[in-house]
């Protein structure tokens, strides 16, 4: 609904007039394998604008652990971890005050995961993420929205461990199937987390 990909069954969704959304799904978009990093991430431009400030593309890519020698490398020659960092660099190169991330830790190496945590902790905006990575949520979120199979949403302050310490518990898939009437389809119970600030 926030992304405008679905329409509400009832009522309406109002978004702020200055809302700028950046979205990354589990598939994370595709990079052009024949193009180099600067072409893929910065549109081939030597400079990019981030939060009203002009940055050199090589300096910006350095924030994502790329050496100046690697920025002209075709994407097809990059490792999987480097490609994931390139996708993150492209995502964060776009102006945004709301990030929507769907399973952002899938297939990330430790170095890239730590980089993502640092970026999210310093992000000046709101982050809505869907994740089953409990450790990651403990590091980056300040609030949880637990989506239940019956359509209810439970809101809790803190990360996953905080919720668990207060007695929170996810129903395991086998248990959930046994508890549901046969006429209802099984619905997964993803955990959605939202950091500090609100849009």
State where each predicted segment sits.
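ABC ATP-binding cassette signature C-motif
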Residues: 1-199
């Amino acid at each position: 609904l926030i992304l405008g990909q679905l329409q509400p069954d009832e009522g309406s969704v109002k978004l702020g007039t200055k809302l700028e959304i950046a979205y990354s799904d589990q598939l994370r978009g595709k990079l052009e394998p024949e193009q180099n990093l600067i072409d893929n991430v910065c549109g081939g431009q030597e400079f990019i604008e981030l939060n009203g400030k002009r940055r050199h593309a090589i300096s910006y890519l350095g924030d994502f652990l790329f050496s100046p020698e690697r920025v002209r490398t075709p994407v097809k020659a990059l490792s999987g971890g480097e490609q994931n960092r390139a996708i993150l660099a492209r995502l964060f190169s776009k102006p945004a005050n709301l990030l929507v991330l769907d399973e952002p830790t899938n297939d990330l190496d430790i170095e890239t995961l730590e980089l993502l945590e640092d970026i999210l902790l310093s992000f000046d905006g709101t982050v809505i993420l869907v994740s089953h990575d409990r450790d990651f949520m403990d590091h980056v979120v300040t609030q949880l929205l637990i989506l239940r199979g019956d359509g209810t949403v439970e809101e809790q302050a803190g990360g996953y461990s905080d919720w668990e310490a207060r007695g929170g518990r996810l129903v395991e898939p086998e248990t959930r199937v046994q508890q549901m009437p046969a006429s209802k389809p099984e619905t997964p119970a993803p955990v959605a987390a939202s950091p500090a600030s609100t849009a």
